[in-house]
Amino acid sequence: MPADLVDVLIIGGGPAGLTAALTLARQLHTAILFDNQSYRNGNSSFMHMIPTWDHKDPAQFREKARQEIFSNYSTIRLENATIAKAEKKDDALFKITDENGSSWEGRKLILATGSQDIFPPIPGYADAWGKRIFHCLFCKGYEDRSAKRAGILAIQSAANVPMAMHQAENAAQLAEQVTIYTNGQEALESQLAAILADKGSKTVFKVDNRVITGVSLNGDDLSNKASVQVQLADGSQVEEAFLVHNPDTQVKSTLATQLGLDLAPSFVPGTGDIAAAAPFYQTSIRGVFAAGDCMTPYKVVAGAISSGCNAAVAASAQLLAEKHGHQPLF
């Protein structure tokens, strides 16, 4: 038996991984939390919808969580490492290896690796992401309430009527006028225009089919006067308080593929999430669990915390049943 064998290997140090570690500690399980310091909200100054941590810095949230875990619980360890390889050794053990060749073994594996956003090829998009381009108007946008204008980028997987209208309706809660940018997609423009005309909604919503050639920030994320400039192919520019776009995503890291895990169906080839059903979030391989952004299209901190807890409770249930030779709960 390897000297560095632990009960659970947790890959990912965001809210899901941190919650999984804390949950396992409460039942005296040994676990290692692997963190490569790469986070989806790393470009954001604030996080929301977390009681006691609403409109506060996500980096400080992670630091405070680490302090609580590693100050109070001796069975959890932290490794600042990027895991490059994961494999199932046998029915009882998993082995992971980092990019420097160091390896660890565990009885259970929790993947909380997060997801990778696939940005559209619009100049300036990456710089504005998380600052003036919002993927979720529950997470961002409230601070811009009563804005004169906001825009929807109806591109990528949002280039359809249901998603474009859903995002526009959310934006209309916060802005007086909402423009849906269809970026040269004439069929989508016509469909949206017909719906808006039929509903008599032209005073709030409008459609702009001009091709977007770039976006740029005005001000910074900490200023209530910040905005985003939309550059269009005809040379004109439009200033919006914020843009809404939920980019396509793919599972971050290749570990799920290496393990042969099933992925949830996706409309866009090469994108999607790890298939892991509630409430236990076990994947297609027994003993491997997924938590956080890597296993759901609803990528918010509150959801990551919830799934991290559930995955850890499920891993614990299997570990304890195996320890005592009992029939497992699942």
Spans of features found by a protein language model:
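Conserved FAD-binding catalytic core of PHBH/FMO-like flavoproteins
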Residues: A128-L174, T179
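FAD-site-proximal beta/loop scaffold in flavoenzymes
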Residues: D127-D144, N246-V300, N310, A317
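FAD-binding core/adjacent interface of flavoenzyme oxidoreductases
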Residues: A3-V6, I76-K148, P269-T271, A275-P279
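A Rossmann-like FAD-binding core segment of flavoenzymes
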Residues: E63-D91, K95-D98, A175-D273, L320-F330
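Eukaryotic N-terminal targeting leaders
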Residues: M1-L5, L329-F330
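A conserved FAD-binding loop/helix module that cradles the flavin
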Residues: A21-L22, M165-E169, A291-F330
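Beta1-alpha1 glycine-rich phosphate/pyrophosphate-binding loop at the start
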Residues: V6-E63, A158-E186
